[in-house]
Amino acid sequence: MEREIIQTLDGSTTIHLKEWDECYHSKHGAIQEAQHVFIKNGLTLFENKSVSILEIGFGTGLNAFITFLESKKLYQSIDYVGVEAYPVSAEEVLSMNYVAELNAEKEAMIFQKMHESNWNEQIKLSENFMLTKRKQFFDAIDDIEKFDLIYFDAFGYRVQPELWSTAIFQKMHNALKPQGKLVTYAARGVVKRSMIEVGRSEEHTSE
């Protein structure tokens, strides 16, 4: 599938899949979306705590990188697991301008290390941030009550409805601790219904 790097409205870059006319992030702003959906509605709910996070769709690493930056401000200890079936290429990673757009030049090596680290191995990015990238299909996730927070950032329902099925959300429900939260950018009715069917009615969604 043909891919291209585009600039979103907030100046940050993303990957556009031409055949699907689908982007890895919102065209209105990749960084803006990550900060609003996953940080404001997710990470900040766990201030001053140790937080275990599962990201569904590691992609360009933007959510992981912003989480790293924000966790330093919030004095959080993070155990981050990012699941991705189709990793982005090294060339695409180099085209992402997140370090500059986030004024995070001092942490440029962290973003690089996130992508250069081996799959399926836990690495220590700092004293308070552990990262594991799992090369895995979403329907193979079998964690049980392991995570405080899930960033559900799969491609949209329009192009991959199977990723938004009740079966997938049952796996998400199983992976969350009893008081865990799932956050996602999508607010479609079918998504909310799937969440409710598996007993998760408190998730935060944002379009």
Predicted regions and their residues:
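Local beta-strand N-terminus motif with an aromatic residue
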Residues: 50, 146-147
